[in-house]
Design a protein with these regions (language model features):
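Conserved N-terminal beta1-alpha1 strand-loop-helix module at the mouth
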Residues: 1-83, 87-91, 98-101, 114-120
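Short glycine/serine/threonine/alanine-rich loop segments
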Residues: 104
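Active-site pocket-lining/capping segments in soluble small-molecule metabolic enzymes
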Residues: 107-111
Length: 120
């Protein structure tokens, strides 16, 4: 059966809180967008301002230039899945390995112009 997973993209903590509260009565899985304003032109609420109900399954799409700066906090937050982008300027393997060692699933996203077979 298909599952509808709402995406949360908020630029400030107040909007984030309102959105989470609005989704709480019916959502059990959500996709949270995290953007640093460097890798992606938009800057979202900070990772330190993100929270969610304990019974939620959470996927975090981290559109950040330096994923390694976020890994320790992500491990503490315990999302179900973290997606980083292949186009970042650092080796993703250490970050991915740390998340996987903590029981967090990982994924790698591609920007539209990136050809999949060019990713190492």
């Amino acid at each position: 059966m298909a599952e509808i997973v709402p995406t949360v993209l908020c630029e400030n903590a107040e909007d984030y809180k309102l959105t989470i509260e609005r989704l709480s009565p019916f959502a059990k899985r959500v996709h949270l967008d995290l953007a640093d304003g460097e890798f992606a032109p938009t800057k979202t609420v900070e990772l330190s301002e993100m929270w969610w109900p304990q019974d939620w399954q959470v996927d975090i799409h981290a559109m950040v230039a330096r994923p390694s700066l976020y890994v320790d906090a992500l491990v503490q937050m315990r999302p179900s899945l973290v997606i980083f982008h292949a186009e970042v300027d650092e080796d993703l393997q250490p970050s991915i390995q740390q998340l996987k060692a903590s029981g967090i699933q990982t994924g790698v996203g591609l920007l539209r112009p990136t050809v999949p077979n060019t990713v190492k």
